[in-house]
Amino acid sequence: MDFAALAATVGAKVYLPGSEGYTESTGSYFSAFENEVQPAGVVQPTSTEEVVEVIKAIREPGLAGKVKVAIRGGGHTPWAGAANIHDGLVIDLRKLAGVRVDKEKKMVSIGAGERWGSVYKTLAEQGLATYGGRVSSAGCAGLILGGELTPT
């Protein structure tokens, strides 16, 4: 897939090799092994709507099943390929952050790109707590789902 063309069709930022955003995203994993994997592109949606746009674009007729995809939450899983994919597209969810507390319903909504440290801080400020990851820099989505999501 031409990821430069993807950038023209979706609202999310698309970063290609050599760009500052690409270097920041691919070089910021917890594991050095994961940092060595080189995707063909990285997309950073900032809303659910942008995630939907990206998924629709890579499922267009002729592309469905041909674009290798990895989903990145916090990027804290220690093995290569857990949240990164060689020559594929990384959907980097770190811009989908935020912690919303509904005290009446006793419910917390956590963005897919949020990290545990922010969750604990937000809840503590309101006299609340939860259990989750022990490492504050670890992403919530990956831990909740049992690791990052990349097909093997």
Regions found by a protein language model. Give the residues of each.
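N-terminal accessory segments
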Residues: 1-152
